[in-house]
Design a protein with these regions (language model features):
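Long cytosolic regulatory regions associated with cyclic-nucleotide signaling
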Residues: 1-16, 75, 120-124, 138-143
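Cyclic nucleotide-binding regulatory domains
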Residues: 4, 29-91
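Short proline/glycine- and basic residue-enriched helix-capping loop/turn segments at helix->loop/beta transitions
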Residues: 6-27, 82
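Cyclic-nucleotide recognition modules
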Residues: 12, 18, 64-119, 126
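Positions in alpha-helical segments
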Residues: 26, 61, 101, 127-130
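Polybasic "coupling" helices that flank or enter modular domains
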Residues: 108-152
Length: 152
């Protein structure tokens, strides 16, 4: 029998929250900025955070808000990558922060939690795929990418 998805998410959140350090952010404070090295993950416990992808000095490409119960920067922290977007507290916000080294050590010792992280990353990837599908359906394919690098 499969695990209950809600208990699965609760177990993961509780486990990561137990090894986190609470950080408080005033309204308007950046949690992280696009292009910075990801030093850990953020568990939004209270408040609201604005996420966006800046395009130089031009327009914002994507923007949305997230609230309590959201985990940020998991993929970037696991892959030792840089942040793909920027995050700023919209109101006074509390986030549990788990440094990358702490996270990786914990995952090496707790295989069940490690598998839950893998599942979470997989679900994120599927969600992104479906978002691209919806975007593709919403806009006519007037310019289609070709494998040879051109467009038609």
């Amino acid at each position: 029998m499969a695990d209950d998805p809600s208990s699965f998410a609760t177990d993961l959140w509780a486990s990561l929250e137990a090894i986190s350090v609470v950080r408080r952010y005033e309204s308007g404070t950046l949690l992280f900025e696009q292009g910075e090295s990801a030093s850990g993950i953020y568990l939004i416990q209270k408040g609201q955070v604005r996420l966006w992808i800046p395009e130089g000095s031009g327009p914002i490409i994507l923007a949305r808000s997230v609230a309590s119960g959201t985990m940020l920067a998991l993929s970037e922290a696991i892959s030792e990558g840089t942040h793909k977007l920027s995050a700023m507290a919209l109101v006074q916000t509390e986030a549990g922060f788990v440094p990358r080294e702490t996270l990786m050590g914990y995952l090496r010792e707790h295989h069940k939690i490690c598998l839950q992280v893998v599942r979470t990353l997989s679900e994120d990837l599927h969600g992104l795929y479906h978002s691209f599908q919806r975007l593709n359906l919403a806009h006519p394919r007037s310019r289609r990418w070709q494998p040879d690098g051109g467009t038609q």
